[in-house]
Amino acid sequence: EWTRPIYFSTTVGSDYYMSLENNFQLEGLAYRIVPYGGKNGSFINTDIMYDKIMNDFRWGGMDKNPDMYLDETCRRMCSTLRSTFNQLASELIAEGKTEKAQKVLQKCIEVIPYSVAPYEIIMLYVADNFYKCNDEKNGDLVLNTLIKDYGESLIWSKKLGRYNMRTNYQENAYYSEEIQRSLL
């Protein structure tokens, strides 16, 4: 009898999962262990996750204070949260629920605004999902912001000089490939 659920945080390293990944059900920021397994590892209960993200979670007021300062740890958590939004949206799209997916993506850019937490690479996938939901306006907004930031990063890297520019080469090459891939 599974009367008391057991959860693992999504931020815990996979080394601690004790080979239970096939029995993980993603419900927001936690994996719930369930007695049945997914086909290829963990799976998402979109109904539970949608309700938690859209109604239960509190977002700390980032959307109300564009001057809020986030330290590096908080900015990394914003990336984790954006990834969670995107995972849910991807699964909703796969289920044919594009209207709900679009609402999830819209909430993502509203509650974790660019002004407080600049976009990172996960936002390419958010932009792609906006396009899959036929929301070209928001897809373009996110993608154009990423392209602008990437261009500014390249200009900054060039000013570092040839030797120091090499340290940023790998990251810049990765971003360039991902942006090109998203434009196809």
What kind of region is each of these model predictions?
Residues 1-184:
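ER/secretory pathway lumenal C-terminal domains and tails of membrane proteins involved
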